Amino acid sequence: MLKSSNKRKSKEEKKLQEGKYLGVRRRPWGRYAAEIRNPFTKERHWLGTFDTAEEAAFAYDVAARSISGSLATTNFFYTENTSLERHPQQSLEPHMTWGSSSLCLLQDQPFENNHFVADPISSSFSQKQESSTNLTNTFSHCYNDGDHVGQSKEISLPNDMSNSLFGHQDKVGEHDNADHMKFGSVLSDEPLCFEYDYIGNYLQSFLKDVNDDAPQFLM
């Protein structure tokens, strides 16, 4: 008699506990399932199964607040400053994943946390590499054509020539020597600039080396 009465009491308590929370149903094997109905689209969203009724009720509250905001009807009382950061542990059905539309309602994280953040080291290296490429591919020099003295003019160089003149662009970005390659500022009214002399001297020495290495033919 005592065992039967205890079983009845336990069943009644479970029924009361099951009907106590919104969107919570007790499974025959003892776990609790949570689901919610969207009042705007009239669709039902499956939230998962939980060990306790309180966890299932909390999952329902998170989904309800994500749909209707502070006007949602919830199982527990929440203030406006309450943050629903704690997600209850739940077991997913075999056909469900965290990316499904129903489980997305449980995610109450800030919008920026759902995106990948660029690696600051790789991004800074790419910026240095891009800046060094732009610096090595163009340079400015001064010229004198009579009326226009000290005017600036940009000349584009091939990649192979610019790399040989100013050093490889990866090394420039690695050792932070880009400041030594800032050409293009006009020096007052002087007809010649250091950059132009440097390029001319380099080309002359290069042509001299080529001529010296060329085979000599006897006439």
UniProtKB/Swiss-Prot annotation:
Classification via Pfam families: AP2
DNA-binding region ranges: 20-77
GO cellular component: nucleus
One GO biological process term: ethylene-activated signaling pathway
Cross-referenced Gene3D superfamilies: AP2/ERF domain
Keyword vocabulary terms for this entry: Activator, DNA-binding, Ethylene signaling pathway, Nucleus, Transcription, Transcription regulation
UniProt GO molecular function: DNA binding; DNA-binding transcription factor activity
Family to which the UniProt record says this protein belongs: Belongs to the AP2/ERF transcription factor family. ERF subfamily.
Function: Probably acts as a transcriptional activator. Binds to the GCC-box pathogenesis-related promoter element. May be involved in the regulation of gene expression by stress factors and by components of stress signal transduction pathways.
Protein's name in the database: Ethylene-responsive transcription factor ERF088
Gene source species: Arabidopsis thaliana (Mouse-ear cress)
